[in-house]
């Protein structure tokens, strides 16, 4: 079926630890159950599969979705990353726009305790970093869409088979010079 994946670098890992683990660039990959509309609409299911990791992961983080019309949202990463979307009409979103900073305090926050993450204030809202470590995304078969709002490291997007769409947007930063997509983005359409 259709899967919804969330990749995010966070302030600290708290679940399962007596003391929050904040060193070594903590991050997680989560498989959010339910539909993309449920997740976006603020009514996601509570059964989430989450894997915590940090920059000391051996080699590379690889996330495979296999079949289905899957969605990958990347707010940030903490290691070299490969996304393999497999078969289906998939979407990969690198960097997301929010209406407020993603902080846990003051209560009630916009994220769970420890899951705070950096955003950049733009003229359109608060933008997540996208990718701090190099990222490669493979579209596999199907008509895939790749959208980049922000990247702080080189990213490579490979459409593979099907009619794929590549969108790279730049946002003006608020109160500072520069744009949100200043790093290298390679888009390869495939066959």
What is the role of each PLM region?
Residues 1-191:
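Acidic, glycine-rich low-complexity segments
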């Amino acid at each position: 079926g259709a899967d919804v994946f969330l990749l995010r670098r966070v302030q600290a890992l708290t679940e399962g630890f007596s003391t929050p683990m904040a060193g070594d660039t903590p991050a997680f990959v989560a498989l959010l159950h339910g539909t993309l509309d449920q997740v976006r609409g603020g009514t996601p299911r509570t059964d989430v599969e989450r894997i915590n990791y940090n920059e000391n992961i051996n080699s590379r983080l690889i996330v495979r979705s296999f079949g289905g019309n899957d969605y990958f949202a990347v707010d940030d990463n903490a290691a070299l990353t490969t996304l393999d979307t497999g078969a289906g009409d998939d979407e990969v979103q690198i960097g997301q726009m929010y209406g407020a900073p993603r902080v846990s305090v003051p209560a009630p926050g916009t994220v769970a305790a420890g899951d705070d993450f950096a955003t950049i204030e733009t003229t359109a809202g608060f933008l997540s970093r996208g990718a701090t470590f190099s990222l490669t995304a493979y579209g596999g078969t199907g008509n895939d869409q790749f959208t980049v709002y922000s990247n702080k490291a080189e990213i490579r997007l490979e459409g593979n088979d099907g009619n794929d769409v590549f969108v790279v947007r730049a946002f003006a930063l608020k109160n500072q010079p520069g744009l949100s997509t200043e790093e290298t983005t390679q888009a390869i359409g495939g066959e």
